[in-house]
């Protein structure tokens, strides 16, 4: 099967949002999806909060990746955080996931970025095996991820 990874354009927003909803369903998190396509487009294409990639085959979007830039104070250099990577079920195990990572690794190389990081749900064994097969190391043994959102974030603002 032939496919192409490319940077997303504003014309891709509806299909990206559809794929995000598919990912949320797969991850059993559909109830957490609250965005509108307009908000999503504004965040990616106007506010530059993140960047998007699309994988196409025969003119049809079959996967996407969302990433943003990070910074390591210890290295004094930037990196990429991969927020989402998703390939439609019927197109998995055909090299698309690896192609997304290769595309992102090339961005890292071209821009002298020293890290490519992401997280994965602990029950997602197929993805864990895939990531480890590429040489990725599990960081959760040394680091914990924390989040403030919603009411707790608002409380902090109002302290």
Show which residues each predicted segment covers.
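Conserved acetyl-CoA-binding loop-helix of GNAT-fold acetyltransferases
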Residues: 93-106
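A short helix-loop-beta-strand connector motif used in the catalytic cores of GNAT acetyltransferases and
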Residues: 42-54
């Amino acid at each position: 099967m032939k496919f192409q990874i490319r940077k997303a354009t504003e014309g891709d927003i509806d299909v990206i949002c559809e794929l995000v909803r598919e990912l949320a369903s797969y991850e059993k998190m559909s109830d957490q999806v609250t965005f509108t396509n307009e908000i999503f487009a504004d965040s990616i294409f106007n506010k530059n909060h993140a960047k998007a990639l699309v994988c196409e085959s025969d003119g049809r979007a079959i996967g996407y990746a969302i990433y943003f830039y990070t910074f390591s104070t210890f290295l004094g250099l930037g990196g990429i955080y991969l927020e989402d990577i998703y390939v439609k079920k019927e197109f998995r195990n055909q090299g698309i996931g690896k192609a997304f990572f290769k595309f992102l690794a090339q961005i890292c190389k071209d821009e002298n970025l020293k890290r490519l990081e992401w997280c994965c749900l602990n029950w997602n064994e197929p993805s864990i095996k895939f990531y480890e097969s590429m040489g990725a190391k599990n960081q959760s043994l040394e680091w914990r991820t924390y989040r403030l959102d919603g009411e707790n974030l608002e409380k902090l603002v109002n302290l």
